[in-house]
């Protein structure tokens, strides 16, 4: 099992990552932008803390945009890059394409075991399960 901190608060990441109990970080570019920051600058700051797995979300609904942006982020940030895509038909298609190129993928918005199986079959290395809306 791996534990990922779901935040872009660099100070908080530094505190928790330093415990040795956190395996990586997941981020949300929409929330980063709302805070007035640039997502790629935040990724750079997180990387400087020594975090070796950052899930970088791409906001699109087109598998080829996921692929294009995923390649660009992998080129820029290297081995710390994991691309975060939703468990949608386009997200799963992108997962398959990215993973075939050796780019790690974290599939999010998983609400059922069936979705987890689909994401695994598409090549996801991480699955982010969401709480059931009924919980």
Question: Which positions does each model-derived feature cover?
Answer:
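N- or domain-start disorder-to-order transition segments that initiate the globular core
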Residues: 1-11
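Structural preference for beta-strand elements that scaffold enzyme active sites
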Residues: 2-4, 24-26, 53-55, 80-82, ...
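Active-site beta->alpha loop and helix N-cap motifs at the rims of alpha/beta catalytic domains
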Residues: 9-12, 19, 33, 38-90
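Catalytic cores of alpha/beta
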Residues: 16, 114-118
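Conserved, mostly hydrophobic/aromatic
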Residues: 28, 83, 119
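The catalytic core of metal-dependent phosphodiesterases that act on cyclic dinucleotides
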Residues: 98, 106-107, 111
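Conserved small/polar residues in nucleotide/adenosyl-binding loops
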Residues: 128-135
């Amino acid at each position: 099992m791996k534990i990922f901190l779901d935040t872009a608060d660099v100070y908080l990441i530094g505190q928790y990552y330093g415990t040795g109990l956190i395996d990586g970080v997941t981020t949300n570019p929409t929330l980063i932008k709302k805070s007035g920051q640039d997502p790629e600058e935040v990724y750079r700051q997180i990387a400087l803390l020594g975090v070796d797995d950052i899930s970088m979300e791409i906001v699109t609904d087109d598998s080829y945009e996921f692929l294009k942006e995923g390649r660009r982020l992998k080129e820029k940030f290297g081995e710390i890059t994991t691309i975060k895509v939703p468990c949608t038909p386009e997200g799963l298609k992108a997962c398959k394409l990215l993973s075939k190129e050796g780019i790690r993928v974290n599939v999010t918005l998983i609400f059922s075991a069936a979705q987890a199986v689909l994401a695994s079959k598409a090549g996801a290395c991480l699955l982010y399960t969401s709480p059931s809306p009924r919980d």
